[in-house]
């Protein structure tokens, strides 16, 4: 029996909890030792916190617990310092928080790397505490951030000087190798028991949510793969699944088009090289190929090739190549379609099998 792995909390959750504790100290004089927080999915959690109250400001510190996930930020101290201001809630990045220096990310250039969901979580956590008509400045810092950021993809993404405040659900799902990989397989059994012969394989919860909420794909047919796309494809063959739709962000699934089936960025990250090679084969100029290689995200690549002669059908052909490589992996024993999404959940490209599968489920646009 596979032991259940312990979940942890994102940097965004820790920052929101620390912000709430600092706000309580600043406005109400309460120096709490634990703080209760509601996560984006409605789950209520309680985190231990240390609070220091000064005359004009308050600071709260939460130690990040990543659970059983091998996370570089596990055990780091996330600080939030709160100060009163005339109106509104302002977020600032302090020591160890990276600054976005290149376009294509979810945060504008020049802003601290605090992603949209954590920003909303932080503001929601303190909104009811700040008196009407008044405001507060919140400065988030991670003293070890600059050092730890060198062990992440932030430097390659153009996020300089520190770590990012991340998270979409507030929860860190454990991703330790064999145990976690094995724990994913029962999802297939449950889906088959529900009567599905076609499954959706998606690397993460953002893709899962977009599939369900934006496109109406059946929730019980959606399988989370994390980075183990190849392993789950082979598990589908073993269980005689008939069709699979690979579904997710283009930056993840483009790796499959290059024959990469374990997609963790520490093991394989050739996104730009794969796209550049396929663009060159489609007729891209040398200048465009160089710009693709210099881009940091798929969204940035979209802007590079927008309006080019080869753009029409390019992302569809990339999706088709991912499907072909996946089909080759399982020796043709599975019919595979692929749909590539951007960060907003819009379909960048999909092949004919993906269109057919989505059409069978009532989405035929």
From Swiss-Prot:
UniProt gene name: cbiD
Pathway: Cofactor biosynthesis; adenosylcobalamin biosynthesis; cob(II)yrinate a,c-diamide from sirohydrochlorin (anaerobic route): step 6/10
The species this protein was found in: Moorella thermoacetica (strain ATCC 39073 / JCM 9320)
InterPro entries in the record: CbiD, CbiD_sf
Full protein name: Cobalt-precorrin-5B C(1)-methyltransferase
This protein's UniProt keywords: Cobalamin biosynthesis, Methyltransferase, S-adenosyl-L-methionine, Transferase
UniProt xrefs under Gene3D superfamilies: CbiD-like
HAMAP family documented for this protein: CbiD (MF_00787)
Keyword S-adenosyl-L-methionine: yes
GO function term, MF aspect, one: cobalt-precorrin-5B C1-methyltransferase activity
Recorded catalytic activity of this chain's protein: Co-precorrin-5B + S-adenosyl-L-methionine = Co-precorrin-6A + S-adenosyl-L-homocysteine
PANTHER family from the UniProt entry: COBALT-PRECORRIN-5B C(1)-METHYLTRANSFERASE
UniProt family annotation: Belongs to the CbiD family.
Keyword S-adenosyl-L-methionine set for record: yes
The organism's place on the tree of life at top rank: Bacteria
NCBIfam families: cbiD, PRK00075.1-1
Enzyme Commission no: 2.1.1.195
GO terms classed as biological process: anaerobic cobalamin biosynthetic process; methylation
Top-level enzyme category: transferase
Pfam families referenced in this protein's UniProt entry, alphabetically: CbiD (PF01888)
């Amino acid at each position: 029996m596979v032991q259940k792995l312990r979940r942890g909390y994102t940097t965004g959750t820790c920052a929101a909890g620390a912000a709430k504790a600092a706000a309580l100290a600043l406005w109400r004089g309460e120096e709490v030792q634990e703080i209760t927080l509601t996560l984006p999915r409605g789950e209520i959690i309680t985190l231990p916190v240390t609070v220091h109250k000064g005359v004009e400001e308050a600071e709260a510190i939460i130690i990040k617990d990543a659970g059983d996930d091998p996370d570089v930020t596990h055990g780091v101290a996330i600080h939030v310092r709160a100060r009163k201001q005339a109106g509104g809630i302002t977020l600032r990045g302090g020591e160890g928080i990276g600054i976005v220096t290149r376009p294509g990310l979810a945060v504008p250039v020049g802003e601290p790397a605090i992603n949209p969901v954590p920003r909303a979580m932080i503001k929601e956590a303190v909104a009811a505490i700040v008196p009407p008509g008044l405001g507060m400045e919140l400065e988030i810092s991670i003293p070890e951030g600059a050092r730890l950021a060198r062990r992440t993809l932030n430097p390659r993404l153009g996020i300089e000087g520190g770590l990012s405040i991340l998270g979409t659900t507030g929860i860190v799902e454990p991703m330790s190798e064999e145990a976690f990989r094995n724990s994913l397989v029962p999802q297939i059994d449950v889906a088959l028991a529900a009567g599905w012969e076609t499954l959706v394989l998606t690397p993460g919860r953002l893709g899962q949510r977009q599939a369900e909420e934006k496109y109406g794909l059946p929730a019980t047919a959606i399988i989370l793969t994390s980075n183990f796309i190849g392993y789950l494809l082979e598990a589908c063959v073993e269980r005689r699944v008939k069709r699979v739709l690979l579904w997710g962000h283009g930056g993840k699934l483009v790796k499959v088009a290059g024959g990469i089936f374990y997609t963790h960025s520490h093991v394989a990250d050739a996104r730009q090289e794969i796209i550049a090679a396929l663009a060159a084969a489609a007729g891209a100029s040398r200048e465009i190929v160089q710009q693709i290689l210099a881009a940091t995200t798929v969204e940035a690549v979209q802007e590079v090739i927008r309006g080019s002669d080869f753009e029409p059908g390019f992302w569809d052909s990339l999706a088709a190549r991912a499907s072909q490589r996946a089909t080759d992996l399982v020796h043709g024993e599975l019919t595979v379609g692929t749909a590539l999404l951007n960060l907003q959940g819009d379909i960048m490209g999909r092949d004919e099998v993906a269109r057919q599968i989505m059409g069978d489920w009532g989405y035929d646009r």
